[in-house]
Amino acid sequence: MAIRKYKPTTPGRRGASVSDFAEITRSTPEKSLVRPLHGRGGRNAHGRITTRHKGGGHKRAYRMIDFRRNDKDGVNAKVAHIEYDPNRTARIALLHYLDGEKRYIIAPNGLSQGDVVESGANADIKPGNNLPLRNIPAGTLIHAVELRPGGGAKLARSAGSSIQLLGKEASYASLRMPSGEIRRVDVRCRATVGEVGNAEQANINWGKAGRMRWKGKRPSVRGVVMNPVDHPHGGGEGKTSGGRHPVSPWGKPEGRTRNANKSSNKFIVRRRRTGKKHSR
């Protein structure tokens, strides 16, 4: 993938860029693997906003992605197409299995039309192949990693992301996450070899607010520019700092949203670096 820059023909196009979509080989998805996707606009069943800054955007159809691949061990598949998916930053690959079934997977970097991929403990260590962690050598870059055996891929699924397998000890493998966190995962969990493609996604300059609206993202307004009735930081004469430590619109202190006693914390060997210091 490469980035194509627009000429500054309008203020919205000045500095804006877009993917050249050179790796895309098909413009329409496989009909049997598409499901309708109903936009909620950040509302719950009562119509109340539960997630702010969401709504609008272009209509999408959901592509059914195979995040497990454990029922196709030993069955080779040919990459029929590399396709665009509006629901994620990564590209997706349409696989045609030898038994006639078709499935989508996340397209890793280097996978192209016509390649053959496989899954199972005896699969080769090459991009696109899916194996249990116990069968992958240390130092390998992987993506689409399970947190629990058979639970489906949960980690490293976005464009350009990857996890490094540092080593294996007893029934656990040590993984270095994209955040820098080192975590232990059961060696029976499966992962796909390689890093996710479309890494240049992070370098796209969206150029104007309207392109964010096309993606279904609404404006995020700072509390200090609101009125006191709308936010604890609002009001005051002239430009103010908010007058207190940062809080949410409902008065909750900023940050510290995670459960300190989460049961899976025991699998974290080294925490990610957040750049923040919280006193408890």
UniProtKB/Swiss-Prot annotation:
GO terms for biological process: cytoplasmic translation. GO terms for molecular function: rRNA binding; structural constituent of ribosome; transferase activity. Residues 27-59, 225-280 are annotated as: Disordered. Disulfide bonds: none annotated. One of its GO terms (cellular component) is large ribosomal subunit. Keywords: Ribonucleoprotein, Ribosomal protein, RNA-binding, rRNA-binding. Residues 37-59, 268-280 have a biased composition (Basic residues). InterPro entries: NA-bd_OB-fold, Rib_uL2_dom2, Ribosomal_uL2, Ribosomal_uL2_bac/org-type, Ribosomal_uL2_C, Ribosomal_uL2_CS, Ribosomal_uL2_dom3, Ribosomal_uL2_RNA-bd_dom. NCBIfam families: rplB_bact. One of the primary rRNA binding proteins. Required for association of the 30S and 50S subunits to form the 70S ribosome, for tRNA binding and peptide bond formation. It has been suggested to have peptidyltransferase activity; this is somewhat controversial. Makes several contacts with the 16S rRNA in the 70S ribosome. Part of the 50S ribosomal subunit. Forms a bridge to the 30S subunit in the 70S ribosome. Belongs to the universal ribosomal protein uL2 family. This is Large ribosomal subunit protein uL2. It comes from Mycobacterium tuberculosis (strain ATCC 25177 / H37Ra).
